[in-house]
Each structure stands twice: as structure tokens, then as C-alpha cells.
């Protein structure tokens, strides 16, 4: 299970996936490792053009968002009864995908501030 940062290489496509987490997200994924596994699978599907994933643009506000992140889209992924709010930066020319996971929790608690 990742601490604050995780890196993975897809041997088939040679794309490098970088995942960055808040401390809150690390705790959640330690309790719900299957959600992290499914999240990674869905990110790869999304990058490969699969539209059969429940991902939408996040409509809420993110507190304390740094300048770098303001330029990125904030997305929400549904995984069963859980939601993951994240940002993604795709560098296809360098074969790199950066994923910044902001929050992960149950559907009931994800949107509470």
C-alpha cells in the first residue's frame, strides 16, 4: 500500500503512472485497498479511451488548492459506494500520467467539508 507517492509502469504500453496522495487518502486506502486497486484499473482504462467508467467533472470546491493544480480538471470517480476525487495530468509525448488523489471516502461522507 502506498504512503504518499506511488509509481507503476505498464509494461505493455510503457506508460508510467504516478500517484500522489494526501495523508487522509492514504488512511482510507489502507482500510479499503480494493478501492485503490479498482481506481488504478479505471485510470488505465480511461487513458486507453474506455468510456465505460463512472467519471465526471467534480462540481465542488477544493480547499487550499495550489496554483499548479488550478489548471487541472478535478474529477470524481465512482467505485461502488465509494467516491474518489482526483486531478490528472497526461503527458502522452513523455508516456507519463500524473494522478493527484485529493479525497476518497464513502458516498455518504465524501462531500462533507
Task: List each model region and its residues.
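Enriched for short, Lys/Arg-rich terminal
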Residues: 1-8, 26, 74-113
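Arg/Lys-rich, positively charged N-terminal/basic patches that mediate binding to nucleic acids
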Residues: 1-46
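Short amphipathic alpha-helical surface micro-motifs
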Residues: 1-2, 38, 57, 66-69, ...
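Intrinsically disordered, low-complexity boundary segments flanking structured domains
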Residues: 1-5, 43, 58-65, 89
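Intrinsically disordered, low-complexity coil segments
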Residues: 15, 19, 61-72, 90-97
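Short, surface-exposed, polar/charged, turn-prone segments marking secondary-structure boundaries
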Residues: 43-49, 110-113
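A short, surface-exposed loop/turn module that caps and links secondary-structure elements
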Residues: 45-76
Amino acid at each position: 500500500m502506498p504512503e504518499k507517492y506511488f509509481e507503476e509502469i505498464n509494461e505493455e504500453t510503457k506508460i508510467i503512472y504516478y500517484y500522489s496522495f494526501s495523508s487522509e487518502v492514504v488512511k482510507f486506502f489502507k482500510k479499503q485497498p480494493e478501492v485503490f486497486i479498482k481506481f488504478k484499473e479505471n485510470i488505465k482504462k480511461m487513458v486507453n479511451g474506455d468510456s465505460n467508467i463512472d467519471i465526471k467533472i467534480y462540481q465542488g470546491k477544493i480547499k487550499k488548492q495550489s496554483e499548479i493544480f488550478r489548471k487541472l480538471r478535478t474529477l470524481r470517480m465512482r467505485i461502488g459506494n465509494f467516491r474518489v476525487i482526483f486531478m490528472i495530468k497526461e503527458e502522452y509525448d513523455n508516456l507519463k500520467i500524473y494522478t493527484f488523489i485529493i479525497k476518497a471516502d464513502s458516498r455518504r461522507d465524501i462531500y462533507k467539508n
